[in-house]
Amino acid sequence: MRKIIHVDMDCFYAAIEMRDNPTLIGKPIAVGGEAKHRGVLATCNYEARKFGLHSAMSTAQAFKLCPNLILLPVNMPLYKQVSQQIHQIFRRYTDVIEPLSLDEAYLDVTDSTACSGSATWIATEIRQAIFNELGLTASAGIAPLKFLAKIASEQNKPNGQFVIKPEQIEHFIANLPLKKIPGVGKVTAQRLMAMGLNTCADIQHMNKARLLEQFGKLGQRIWAFSHGVDERHVEPHRILKSVGVERTLQHNIDELAQAYVILAELYALLIQRLKTHCPTLSFSMLHKVGVKLKFADFHVTTLEKRGMLITLNSFELLLTQIWQRAAGREIRLIGLHVNLPETTESKTQVQMSLW
């Protein structure tokens, strides 16, 4: 079986800020946009989390919960630089690395000879090297399957690791709450609970067709993971599957005419981003577009359509249709995205550079 490590840095952006400014240690801090600009938190440290703060929370709400919060601006160039340094440490042990974001990655160490081939010791050494050389802590999960490695990395956070050995998989999965499965969000978890499904063992004893009927593609993933099946490999080059832009508005809007103006600006940015990330890709190959709205109550809705050209008119048509879902609610964010083709040629042309 494979030996997979999932490394997840602990409150990465905030940890870098505390490392570089020790006077922040022990105080509630967050990294994100200002409240007056309707910003949201990118991350926060554990002191701030004690007040109920979390990533993606509006900055205004964060200050209501924690009036003494220290808010710092996002310093992306610095975070990318540190991420590259972490990546260099990974390379000492394996070249099979799949970055998920600046602070998170899968490593396949199946063929590594480091630490006598022990994935557990490799994870320990990586975490120690990150701390010794960069002054940051990381958590890690070690398992034969990708989704289990990711779940394991959350078991002993912060600054810890957890191992799921091959002979432990069956027992671990049987007792695993379904809400822990990657891709199962709050709403899906509630739907599963309403059906009397709480753990993977419950899925193992139910009819597969019923699950697929209720949850479609996600149901297939839930079924597979609940039976200990995850055939995904660690991919050294993650493929860029979509390109998108979005904007949190300075003020909520409730009129479609206002949204059209913002849509036109976002469309120009989307075309620019497509040309940057996919310089050799013909727009005629793109036929699936989407529009996203976030309401004032933070609920999100998305509408995607196939067979549409990448034109402003296409996005205006989708916006008109999705606007009906607002049902009188104000809009705080508008987003556009384009799904990229899944041909071999396009995959070689378009790759993520997260490190």
Swiss-Prot record:
Tell me the cofactors it needs.
Mg(2+)
* Organism annotation: Pasteurella multocida (strain Pm70)
Active-site residue list = 104
Annotated positions for site Substrate discrimination: 13
Q: Write the protein's name.
A: DNA polymerase IV
Q: Which Gene3D superfamilies match?
A: 3.30.70.270, 3.40.1170.60, 5' to 3' exonuclease, C-terminal subdomain, DNA polymerase, Y-family, little finger domain
InterPro entries linked to this entry: DNA/RNA_pol_sf, DNA_pol_Y-fam_lit_finger_sf, DNA_pol_Y-fam_little_finger, DNA_polymerase-Y, DNApol_IV, IMS_HHH_1, Rev_trsase/Diguanyl_cyclase, UmuC
The EC code for this enzyme is 2.7.7.7
